Amino acid sequence: MALPHVNVDQLREERYILGEKTLIGLLENCPKNQTIGDNLVRAWSKINNSKYEKIVCSLSGGSDSDVMLDICTKCDKDNKIDYVWFDTGLEYQATKDHLKYLEEKYGIEIKSYRAIKPIPLTCKEYGQPFLSKQVSEFMNRLQKHSFKWEDEAIDVLIPRYCKWNEKKQKWIGCVSALEWWCGSKGSSSKFNITQNKWLKEFIIANPPTFKVSNVCCQYAKKDVSHKLLSEFGYDLNIIGIRKAEGGARSTAYKSCFDENGKSKGNTYDNYRPLFWYKNSDKDEYDKHYGVLHSRCYTEYGLKRTGCCCCPYGRDFEYELKITKEYEPKLFIAVNNIFGDSYEYTRKYKEFCKEMDEKKRNN
C-alpha cells in the first residue's frame, strides 16, 4: 500500500516507473511511516535526476550509514552511485568485516581511501583532540600564540597576544580565541568557554602540558572527501547526517539538501537522505527491511562507531573498556595516540565534581 500524501496515479503519469527498480514498487513495500515514505520519494527523485551523472556516497560502517546505503541501493535504478569509505587508521575490525558483508549483500564495491595524514602522525605533529572540536580549535589557536592561560580581561589580553594592523585598523591574531577564553560575546553565545562548565577554571589551575588540536578529522576525512570530489568530478555528494543526532555536524545544516558545494575545480550538490529521521524512524526502517548492523553494535554493545575511542566521545571510557576486551591491539594503539587527552579529560571531570561539591557546601 502507498502511504498517505503519495499520489500513485500521479507518479505513474510522471513516469517514475523506469527500469527494474520502480518507485511504485518501493512504496508498495514501504512501512506506514510518513517520514520514511516521503524520504524514499525524495531519495528516488534526487538520485535518478538526470542532472546528476556522477554520484558518490560516503559510508562509515555505522548504523546510520547502513540505512542510508539500503535507501541508495533501493533507489539507484541506473547504478550511478559510487560507494566510498574513509579509512582513518583507527577503525574497528568489526567495521571492516561489516563493510565486506555489505559489499556481498548489495553486490557493490566500497572503495577505501586512506587518510591524507594518518591520525597518529597528525596528533604527534599538531596535537591531540580534547573535549570537542570547538574547544580543541580555540585551545590550539591560543597555544600557537604561546598563551599563558591567564585570567585577565579581553582588553588586557588582546594587546599582549595580538598585533595591530594599521591598514585594516583592527587587531589580528588569536582575537576570536581570546574572545572565547574571556567570554566576551556573552554567556548565551556558543563561542564562550563557559559552555563547558568549570573549563576555564580547570585550565588555569591545570595548564595543558601537551599540544591540543582538532585537525585529525580534517586530514583523515574532510580533506580526503574534498580531494575525491575534486578529482572525480562528482556532481552529487550523499552523506549520512541526521538532525536528531545533534552535534556540530547536524546543526550546521538546515535541511536535507543544499546546492553549489565547492571543492577544488568542481561544484556539487549535497544530499542527506537521513536528515529528518528520528531514532524511532531508523529503528522502524531497520525492522521492516531487515537491516543488520555491525558487531560493534550487536556484540560489542557500542552506541557509535567511527574513529575508535575518540576523545570527543562522551562515552570514551566505555569504548576503551570494550576495545580492550574485543580488540586489544587497537586498545594499545589509541592509548599511545590519545593518552594525554584521556588523562586530561579524566582530570577535568574530577575537577568538575570537586567544584560542584564546593558550590553545594558553600
Predicted regions mapped to residue ranges:
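ATP-dependent adenylation/nucleotidyltransferase module used to activate substrates
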Residues: 2-281, 286-288
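ATP/NTP-dependent adenylation/nucleotidyl-transfer catalytic domains that generate, transfer
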Residues: 2-24, 52, 266-267, 279-362
